A protein has these predicted regions:
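Short, glycine/charged-enriched secondary-structure capping and boundary segments
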Residues: 22-24, 54-55, 124-127, 150-153
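Soluble, non-transmembrane catalytic domains of enzymes that act on hydrophobic metabolites at membranes
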Residues: 2-47, 105-108, 112-113, 130-131, ...
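Active-site-proximal region of nucleotide-activated glycan assembly enzymes
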Residues: 126-166
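Short, well-ordered alpha-helical microsegments
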Residues: 17, 47-48, 118-120, 144-147, ...
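Conserved N-terminal ligand/cofactor-binding loop architecture of enzyme catalytic domains
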Residues: 23-103
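Glycosyltransferases and closely related glycan-assembly transferases
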Residues: 96-110, 119-136
Length: 166
């Protein structure tokens, strides 16, 4: 039997996304040896346009040295309507890279551990493959998750705590 391909969407921005993806991968390998192959993809670095492709370097400095502007961006884009508008802009801006990701990395299951990647990547996979891969959104924030994290069209949305769910 051919192993199922699992693609993890993450970025090394310092928010624990890689650690979450690696923990899920390790658990799956332990529980289902040989059933899956795994690939971790740093979406910001490999598939987003400038200056977003620099986010792994920019983001830690931004949240530590310009926290007020980060918080403003969080608040301006949080909420159902505001996040939908922001995501529509992101989808258009990132479209080419997300299509390239879907073409270069065919998947049976896509697991997003970064809130900004779920919608644009899911949209690209839906348009580029003969079938739609299963899509799992993993919320990594324990308390105050952004609206982007809760992807309504995902097959599963895994939320770590009741506080994050509420």
């Amino acid at each position: 039997m051919t192993p199922k391909r699992v693609v993890f969407l993450m970025s090394d921005t310092g928010g624990g996304h890689r650690a979450a993806a690696e923990a899920i991968r390790a658990a799956m390998e332990c529980c289902y040896p040989g059933v899956y192959t795994f690939e971790l993809v740093d979406v910001y670095r490999r598939y987003t346009p400038f200056p977003m492709n620099l986010m792994p370097e920019i983001y830690p400095r931004w949240v530590n040295w310009a926290a007020a502007s980060w918080e403003l961006g969080f608040r301006l884009t949080d909420g159902r309507r505001r996040s939908a508008l922001a995501m529509a802009v992101i989808n258009r801006w990132w479209r080419r890279g997300m299509r390239r990701l879907a073409a270069e990395r065919p998947a049976d299951v896509v697991v997003s551990v970064h809130s900004l990647f779920s919608r644009p990547v899911m949209h690209a996979y839906n348009q580029s493959q003969a079938f739609r891969p299963r899509f799992v959104a993993v919320v990594t924030d324990l308390v105050s998750a952004h609206a982007f994290a809760f992807e309504k069209d995902a097959d599963r949305c895994l939320i770590p705590t009741l506080a994050a769910y509420e």
